[in-house]
A protein has these predicted regions:
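Alpha-helix N-cap/helix-start and coil->helix boundary motif
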Residues: 12, 96, 120, 194, ...
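Generic alpha-helical secondary structure signal
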Residues: 74, 112-115, 125, 170, ...
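Generic structural signal for individual residues within well-ordered alpha-helical segments
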Residues: 77, 99-100, 115-118, 170, ...
Length: 307
């Protein structure tokens, strides 16, 4: 088991009577990408702010590299790079000039750090374009460059692909993956885009209304997705009688009045279809259905799902 880099215990943030985050227990392991997945307003940004000491928790604990965050900020935070909402860049300066100011404030003396960070996110080092002239995607790239400029061990990135076009999303996904695989970085990202989290993360935490519903590796989460056989027949009532005779136990359900769902078949599907036909039933479909991550997300949140 990998070392735990971030651990929270019963982490809670309450505004008045409203709990933005409730008793959150997350575990981010060294050298892996953890995707915190949830709809807008689910509590992702608030969680990340508490992990960085930007907002105090109402209750609960945050530990980073095994050390409690309160009282150890000066030791821990320099080892972390973050993107939370939009950094305060100067509109009348270029991207490079903005990074130079932040580098000076941090006491960063590596002369190549700025150029390397810009190259990593696909922005030119000698570009004369002012920040005010940047597109939303370019602004997001510059924010990520700021997060990685000091070569941190841990990255905490809130919605890092926000504002990017499909090509930009693929590029950001690629260099985030490379930061983990090639440079050994530990990375926590948040997103409301399930498909992107599934392509990028090793481990996933599903958060909804401030509550962590699931925390699993991507492999284990995919294994939890349901798999069943769906039959479409001319008469579901008669088909149910056939299944009762074959299975001798309640392993199926009628869906929408037109379909039968069989969760586990001890009898071969071909034999079931044959039995239907022998009883004079028309079988227009006998298909194995595998639940997608989107379907799983809908099921565990009881909601409409996300992108």
């Amino acid at each position: 088991m990998s070392e735990i880099v971030i651990e929270t215990k019963q982490l809670t943030k309450q505004y008045g009577t409203q709990k933005s985050v409730a008793k959150l227990n997350i575990h981010v392991r060294r050298g892996r990408i953890y995707g915190l997945l949830g709809r807008n307003g689910a509590g992702k940004t608030t969680t990340m702010k508490m992990l960085l000491g930007l907002t105090p928790p109402t209750s609960g604990e945050v530990a980073i590299w095994g050390k409690p965050l309160p009282g150890n900020e000066k030791k821990l935070l320099p080892r972390i790079g973050s993107l939370i909402e939009s950094p305060g860049f100067y509109p009348n300066l270029t991207g490079t000039e903005n990074l130079r100011i932040f580098a000076a404030l941090r006491g960063l003396k590596n002369q190549n750090a700025i150029q390397s960070a810009l190259e990593l996110v696909g922005l030119p080092y000698r570009d004369k374009k002012l920040f005010s002239q940047y597109s939303l995607g370019m602004k997001q790239r510059l924010a990520i460059a700021l997060a990685v400029m000091h070569d941190p061990e841990l990255l905490i990135l809130d919605e890092p692909i926000n504002g990017l076009d499909p090509i930009g999303i693929a590029e950001v996904r690629s260099f985030i993956r490379a930061l983990c695989d090639e440079r050994g970085k530990t990375i926590l990202i948040s997103s409301h885009i399930l498909s992107e989290v599934a392509l990028l993360a090793d481990d996933i935490g599903i958060i909804d209304h401030g509550v962590l519903l699931e925390e699993e590796s991507l492999v284990d989460l995919e294994a939890k997705s349901e798999r069943y056989v769906r039959f479409t027949v001319s008469d579901t009532e008669r088909a149910a009688e056939v299944l009762n005779g074959l299975l001798h136990e309640n392993q199926f359900a009628v869906q929408d009045g037109h379909h039968l769902r069989l969760d586990s078949a001890k009898v071969p599907v071909a034999k079931i279809v044959s039995a239907f036909v022998q009883r004079g039933l028309e079988v227009s479909e006998a298909a194995t259905v595998e639940e997608s991550l989107e379907d799983y997300f809908k099921r565990v949140t009881g909601g409409e799902g996300i992108a």
